[in-house]
């Protein structure tokens, strides 16, 4: 069932995607050479971050109760903070789509997701350290923060080289840790939905549903190690971005299509899995865009 919230989430995603591709058309067309396909994908980093933010925004205004419930209990005015975050998501999505004030918006975006980690997900993970999903949530939002700061580092390289360097290093280390952790989880629990391994089990009707977990782990593990060691880091980050982009289409878009007649909560969950995976792709591609193309320059980042 398509509720008004789910409808607005879908329309926002489609609208921002179309606008982002249009604005990025010159960068996409300019990608040439041996790594042309990856370069074309990297050119869409801003769009791949903006679109999920736009998808998330509507549910902060008229969405499920869990959005307001996620605000820490010690903070007053839960509806206000939910609406505030929705406005922030739309502002960041618009900035990244139009390529205006990217340094400011991506810096603030990184701070916002880091606050989510510190105020919401890390306390939950520490309260039950054996819960693997708690740490998956921590690394997910920490990776989103890293993607924002990778963009901020890229766009502050000329004016603040030292700040740019540590922001990109932070992003590289965070995404390395997340990729390695997620790879291990995929190998241990291949039946769970691939990419960012949260609670959802891959539906049995998806072809090769368990194999998807192993394939994801086989790509994430070497890519994470490459990022950690800073060896072929740009290719490693782009590979993670390409994997997550592919997973957004299959199985997550396929699951959304199959859920078109399902209860609104199931459709909302499917939309959120698409946005999560797509945003993780955008974060990895943002890091790739900030890293040097020439492997001999790895010492600078």
Predicted regions and their residues:
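Extended, low-polarity transmembrane helix blocks
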Residues: 1-62, 81-91, 98-191, 207-218, ...
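Polar, glycosylation-prone regions of secreted, cell-surface, and some intracellular proteins
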Residues: 68, 75, 101-105
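Residue-level signal for alpha-helical context at structural boundaries
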Residues: 75, 201-202, 243, 263
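Membrane-interface interhelical connector segments
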Residues: 62-74, 187-208
